[in-house]
Regions:
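Short glycine/serine/threonine-rich phosphate/pyrophosphate-binding segments
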Residues: 1-6, 29-31
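Glycine-rich beta-alpha junction loops
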Residues: 2, 25, 53-54
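Active-site glycine- and acidic-residue-rich loops that bind
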Residues: 25-31, 66-67
């Protein structure tokens, strides 16, 4: 939340930037809006906004469906004048991989969620180079 930004800023005084992450719910977008405002006030560069859990990906057939109902996160990015980095759909395999000590992305690069993660990471890396 926005209350942690002061602490992060004191630990990393030359912060290159932050990535804001939200889910499609109105409450989450309200909270991230406060974080964006705080970062702007503190002159912390915002690399962009990621829409997390943007739908559900079936681990068997890779079809996507809605997970949350809410507002379009791209609209929030436009309103706040920050780059929209993309959306990452929820995949139940992420939790199972994490619990077993494995990395989801390494084993699932070709999945819908893996490709979405890769796309977002490429945009972040391009932004900070």
């Amino acid at each position: 939340g926005s209350d942690r930004i002061d602490n992060i800023r004191s630990l990393i005084p030359e912060l290159a930037g932050v990535v804001e992450i939200t889910i499609p719910s109105l409450l989450s977008q309200h909270i991230v809006s406060k974080s964006i405002a705080k970062n702007n006030k503190m002159k912390v560069p915002i690399i962009g906004l990621i829409e997390n859990m943007a739908g559900y990906t079936c681990p068997h057939c890779e079809k996507e469906g809605p997970l949350f109902e809410g507002e379009n996160v791209e609209i929030l990015a436009k309103q706040k004048n920050i780059p929209y980095l993309g959306k990452i759909p929820f995949d139940t395999r992420i939790g199972r991989k994490t619990d077993s000590g494995s990395l989801y992305y390494i084993d699932n690069k070709g999945s819908v969620t893996g490709k979405a993660i890769n796309s977002v990471v490429e945009k972040i890396l391009k932004s900070i180079k």
